[in-house]
């Protein structure tokens, strides 16, 4: 489960995951935490 600060972060994370990037990478890029 990803925890993003806001909707923008979540959208960023989801887009990043959609293009098959690792969760950790996406979380870092988008300012999200992996719980």
Swiss-Prot record:
- Keywords annotated in UniProt: Antibiotic, Antimicrobial, Cytolysis, Disulfide bond, Fungicide, Plant defense, Secreted, Toxin
Q: Which GO terms describe its cellular component?
A: extracellular region
What intrachain disulfides are recorded? 4-32, 12-30, 16-26
Which GO molecular-function terms appear in the entry?
Answer: toxin activity
Q: Which InterPro entries match?
A: Thionin, Thionin-like_sf
**Domain of life of the organism in this record?**
Eukaryota
UniProt modification remark: Contains 4 disulfide bonds.
Where is this protein localized, as stated in its record?
Answer: Secreted
A Gene Ontology biological process annotation? symbiont-mediated cytolysis of host cell
What does the protein in this record do?
Antimicrobial peptide disrupting membranes. Has antibacterial against Gram-positive bacteria S.aureus (MIC=6.5 uM) and B.subtilis (MIC=3.25 uM) but not against Gram-negative bacterium E.coli. Has antifungal activity against C.albicans (MIC=3.25 uM).
Family in the record = Belongs to the plant thionin (TC 1.C.44) family.
What is this protein identified as?
Thionin NsW2
